A protein has these predicted regions:
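Short, glycine/serine-rich, charged loops/turns that create anion-binding
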Residues: 10, 35, 83, 125-126
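Short, functional N-terminal and low-complexity linear motifs
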Residues: 12-18, 76-77, 110-118
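Short, hinge-like loop/turn segments at secondary-structure boundaries
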Residues: 47-49, 77, 137-139
Length: 173
């Protein structure tokens, strides 16, 4: 099953996505896309890693090249999040650059083929308007392209607002 969980900053989307994973059986993979730039980032990553360990997640770092990820066994994968991955692929010199959306979608297809459930967390884009230029505009367009394409293929699309899940496609399981 493919699920897209969208929401604004601090909307509760990540917590909701984790709750979906905790309803499943079998291996649980947390695919972390945040790049570690400094000690503060490293501390944040370690804190989150410890929190997920109690929930029986195996954490896999994948800030770039999602199509290179190989899951050890079928199970449920939680990708956190498309916003970081899009920025990394667009702007990291080792990333896909202008082909970021295409590379991410290819990676999502690869992941979907490897697991029973793929739950993807992403940021809501363009709800504050669509008049952005330069790097910001390119980033938002790439993320919107990935969101739209994955939503079309997903079994469930849910937006989390103030911690409340609202289903646009599929039903809560």
């Amino acid at each position: 099953m493919l699920t897209l969980v969208l929401g604004g900053a601090a909307s509760g989307k990540s917590e909701y996505a984790e709750s979906l994973v905790l309803r499943t059986t079998g291996p649980r993979y947390y695919l972390a896309t945040m790049q570690v730039w400094d000690a503060e980032c490293a501390a944040r990553v370690e804190k989150h890693r410890k929190m997920r360990a109690a929930k029986q997640f195996e954490t896999m770092e994948c800030p770039l090249h999602l199509d290179n990820v190989r899951l050890p066994a079928r199970g449920t994968a939680l990708l956190e999040d498309l916003g970081n991955l899009a920025a990394n692929e667009l702007y990291d010199p080792a990333g896909a650059g202008e082909n970021a959306a295409k590379a991410i979608l290819h990676g999502l297809e690869s992941l979907a083929a490897q697991c029973e459930n793929l739950i993807v967390v992403s940021n809501e884009v363009f709800s504050g308007g669509a008049d952005y230029a330069g790097d910001t505009g390119r980033y938002l367009l790439a993320l919107a392209q990935v969101n739209n394409a994955f939503a079309a293929r997903a079994d469930a699309v849910v937006r989390v607002v103030c911690g409340i899940p609202v289903y646009y496609k599929g039903v809560e399981k």
